[in-house]
Amino acid sequence: MAPARRGWHVYLLRCQDGTLYAGATNDLTARVDRHAAGQGARYTRSRLPVELVFAVRVRNRSAALRREAAVKKLTRAEKLALVVRWREKGAAGTPSG
């Protein structure tokens, strides 16, 4: 994975079965590594391997949890649109929210 990205992020993982998992963390690199090692959320443990497909940096924990909840409410198509836009922007987490 890329160099450690510290600060609060909301992220999406694509699981082996094609499903998407949304989460929030204050250490993106470490959290994705834990998911990949089977030490993340119960949901991802049974769906390895996982791939980071979206991440956005947010201001603080409160913003991260709000954004995570909003992402989890999106339809699959809306989540995939986030992934496409993120890749088009060069996969850089940007401060927001």
Sequence positions of predicted segments:
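GIY-YIG nuclease catalytic motif and its immediate N-terminal context
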Residues: 1-58, 62-82, 86-90, 94-97
